Amino acid sequence: MSEKKVFVFGSFTEHETRSFFEQKPTKDPQNSKDKCVGSIQFGSLNLAAENSSVNTNGELKKGEADGTVKSAGSQERLDASRPASSDKNNDSDAKLPRKNSLRVPEHVVQNGIIKEISESNKSLNNGVAVKTDPIGLDNLSMSDGESDPVYKASSSKFQALDNEDFSSDSSSGSIQRKKNLKVPTESVPPVKDFTPRGLINAGNLCFLNATLQALLSCSPFVQLLQKIQLQDIPKADSPTLAAFSEFISELDVPSSSSIRNNVTVVEAGRPFRPAMFEGVLRNFTPDVLNNMSGRPRQEDAQEFLSFIMDQMHDELLKLKEQSPKVTASKSSVISSANDDGDEWETVGPKNKSAVTRTQSFVPSELSEIFGGQLKSVVKAKGTKASATVQPYLLLHLDIHPDGVQGIEDALHLFSAQEDLEGYRASVTGKTGVVSASKSIKIQKLSKIMILHLMRFSYGSQGSTKLRKGVKFPLELNLNRSHLVSLSNESLRYELVATITHHGWDPSKGHYTTDARRKNGQWLRFDDASVTPIGTKLVLHDQAYVLFYKQV
């Protein structure tokens, strides 16, 4: 018999059976094989329809790949990663970043639903128009206890990742750290733009995630982290610096931007869990246990930001075997007679003298980025004016007065003169209450200016939130009236990040961050979700913390 065996079913004569074996193929088997392979369809993805696209009705048409969402006029897209498998046998794969192409920026596929992220006040949910968040954040996942229906979300874009249990660093879903070579800090190259990566929220940790994403938009701060990463940081003495050193190593730096089919491609790495900050959170809230596996309450993002900045400032000084006499968090606006510092009499431009006292402050690499100086002048009847120079890392702006409608109004109120009630001064040897006034102006500008909009107030009946709209610009030009004197410093700042609180109570609600990339593209970070947005969505009026970079 022939080498190939053929089974014939049915009743055939001997002549008919012999003819089957002698029959020659009519086509070349190899050509037939090639033709079949080219038309194989795997699942719902038709490889032969690679040049098709999705029209407005969800039907395929020629021109784009099946499964790709493209908006008309869209010039950028995000290579967003997808949740990894929860299979425990794939631990080795979980350490590698996964990157897939998702064409956006105006449409996002969320749990199988195409959602449009636009400036309009309506979106489609399975073809039905629904009410959206006025800030464009209708798909946020809220913390437990938050009942605001406007910002309540039904699902999270990376829900599968959010529910994963990460018990150790090896299973945290993070990429493997590269071996760091210890080189002089002078050889650190200019800061590059990091691949955006979402941060997993195990429960009430969005204040941490939002703060970290905002800081990553500040290029001088990122460059500082790169220098820290090249040093041996003792974790016991410098837990905050050690956490940031490990955190920055989890981020990839793209070698170059890529353009495909006249569309700029932005790569996004797989979301990971910032477990390296567990010790920092323990120091921030010693009364809260199980910090990274879920917390019983939400924390104030601005308070956490101030805490880690103060900690980094002190730890950087310890590395240089220095210790500050007065830190920014402990400084006061009005100096007392017991304050440490130098005191001298200065003469102003109008030949008016004032007793000036400068608080002792040892600068650090962090304060060189975020730090500036304020000068507070108190004028009392019958006495010489007294001035106090103090450092700052961020400016607290009162937005409660009705006249404050924007950031410029809040800055004007910040530097305006105010009357002091019950001010006691020694006049002609007698101490008594005299009329006095106080004004605060900026003596030294910071490279990164952080503006805290004071939306929360605390009283005997608990905390309340002011939800009034406060406008802020993409480009901020400081008025010279905010400064002590004219200088050669640039008064122009560009917005690089915002932190927004959604909800009514600081112990509840949710935090998100809008951050600008080096190429000017704005991204919205909502825990594990990373979404490109337009500037109209960035310039909403409910921001809580603003980050401006001097240009």
UniProtKB/Swiss-Prot annotation:
UniProt keyword annotations, A-Z: Hydrolase, Protease, Thiol protease, Ubl conjugation pathway
EC numbers: 3.4.19.12
Domain of life assignment: Eukaryota
Gene Ontology biological process terms in this record: protein deubiquitination; proteolysis
UniProt biased composition (Polar residues): 329-338
PROSITE patterns in UniProt: USP_1, USP_2, USP_3
Annotated GO MF terms: cysteine-type deubiquitinase activity
Residue runs in coiled coils: none
Claim: NADP is one of the keywords in the record: no
Keyword rRNA-binding: no
Function as written in the Swiss-Prot or TrEMBL entry: Recognizes and hydrolyzes the peptide bond at the C-terminal Gly of ubiquitin. Involved in the processing of poly-ubiquitin precursors as well as that of ubiquitinated proteins.
Name of the protein described by the UniProt record: Ubiquitin carboxyl-terminal hydrolase 24
Name of the gene: UBP24
